[in-house]
From Swiss-Prot:
Source organism of the structure: Fusarium vanettenii
Originating gene: MAPK
GO cellular component, one term: nucleus
One GO MF term attached to the UniProt entry: MAP kinase activity
Organism classification: Eukaryota, Fungi, Dikarya, Ascomycota, Pezizomycotina
Post-translational modification remark: Dually phosphorylated on Thr-183 and Tyr-185, which activates the enzyme.
EC number: 2.7.11.24
Entry protein name: Mitogen-activated protein kinase
Family in the record: Belongs to the protein kinase superfamily. CMGC Ser/Thr protein kinase family. MAP kinase subfamily.
UniProt motif (TXY) ranges: 183-185
Length: 355
């Protein structure tokens, strides 16, 4: 094992990486709440990789996210989902306090791409197509990603796209009480479907489809469509564009409190997407309209979206693989998460790495 200190662009502190001597650590490429990502070279093969160092053991929530991430990224084997090439095995359980995931190195992410350049219509088509292609695999496995946003779509120079960060993912099949969902739901609200904010007893695959709609809108215009400052502002921005829900959609909202809240708001007329996106093609706007349907029941599915004429240049039903449904016990730890101590979660992570 070698301890390497990659150069830190902020210069504020040293970051130590306890990884195998097979890896030559290069630069810090990203930093999050409980992890750092460095680029590295795998010396035996010369392959460039990303090494994600995670220190999750201070918080149960970070442990849960790490466990979900490891289990799901190992489960999926898909061109548009980031893969784990290896996980650094710790020396022993006693000294185990960091997790190192070795992954494919991607050059940038959608958030940076949108901020630094105008994306062509062809780029938008290809990126949304790849996102939906990944989502088809997830949804066929009965997995909801729940945190799709531009920074979780990794890109390289060939315009290959890979979805990452499965820390909030959940089984779509488990409809046990989801009230714990919001406590852990620290995801960016800008890409959150309206039904998540209006009631959190049930959520479906349609929440991911809404996020794809928000991402497409942002790629087309270069700025977020619904940049809410808080819960109320978020809903207001959505209704400012989509208009007050129809009676049918209004009664589709399960929660009485949520219905009363909507009723208390002033009536809004729908703003035509053509007004918001004057330079965008009719086909792109038609898909956007279907992705951003207020009522999740009326929202387009991933399979339907892949067949939409806007994506026709890329759609190939023979090359859009599904994944087998995840077994019932796959998310067992999530069912018992409120009763698991940090030590028990650490043991589960250790077992997952060592398997």
């Amino acid at each position: 094992m070698s301890r390497s200190n990659p150069p830190n662009p902020t210069g504020s502190r040293k970051i130590s990486f306890n990884v195998s001597e097979q890896y030559d650590i290069q630069d810090v490429v990203g930093e999050g709440a409980y992890g750092v990502v460095c680029s590295a070279i795998h010396k035996p093969s010369g392959q460039k990789v990303a090494i994600k160092k995670i220190t999750p053991f201070d918080h149960s929530m970070f442990c849960l996210r790490t466990l979900r991430e490891m289990k799901l990224l190992r489960y999926f084997n898909h061109e548009n989902i980031i893969s784990i090439l290896d996980i650094q095995k710790p020396r022993n359980y006693e000294s185990f306090n960091e997790v190192y995931l070795i992954q494919e190195l991607m050059e940038t992410d959608m958030h940076r791409a949108i901020r630094t350049q105008d994306l062509s219509d062809d780029h938008c088509q290809y990126f949304i197509y790849q996102t939906l292609r990944a989502l088809k695999a997830m949804h066929s496995a009965n997995v909801l990603h729940r945190d799709l946003k531009p920074s979780n779509l990794l890109l390289n120079a060939n315009c290959d796209l890979k979805v990452c960060d499965f820390g909030l993912a959940r089984s779509a099949a488990s409809q046990e009480d989801n009230s714990g969902f919001m406590t852990e739901y620290v995801a960016t609200r800008w890409y959150r479907a309206p039904e998540i904010m209006l009631t959190f007893k049930e959520y479906t695959k349609a929440i991911d489809v809404w996020s794809v709609g928000c991402i497409l809108a942002e790629m087309l215009s270069g700025k977020p469509l619904f940049p809410g400052k808080d819960y109320h502002h978020q809903l207001t921005l959505i209704l400012d564009v989509l208009g007050t829900p129809t009676m049918e959609d209004y009664y589709g909202i399960k929660s009485r409190r949520a219905r009363e809240y909507i009723r208390s708001l002033p009536f809004k007329k729908k703003v035509p997407f053509r007004t918001l996106f004057p330079k965008t093609s009719d086909l792109a706007l038609d898909l956007l309209e279907k992705l951003l349907a207020f009522n999740p029941v009326k929202r387009i599915t991933v399979e339907e979206a892949l067949k939409h004429p806007y994506l026709e240049p890329y759609h190939d039903p023979e090359d859009e693989p599904t994944a087998p449904p995840i077994p019932e016990e796959f998310f067992d730890f999530d069912k018992h998460k409120d009763n698991l101590s940090k030590e028990q979660l650490k043991q589960l992570i250790y077992q997952e790495i060592m398997r």
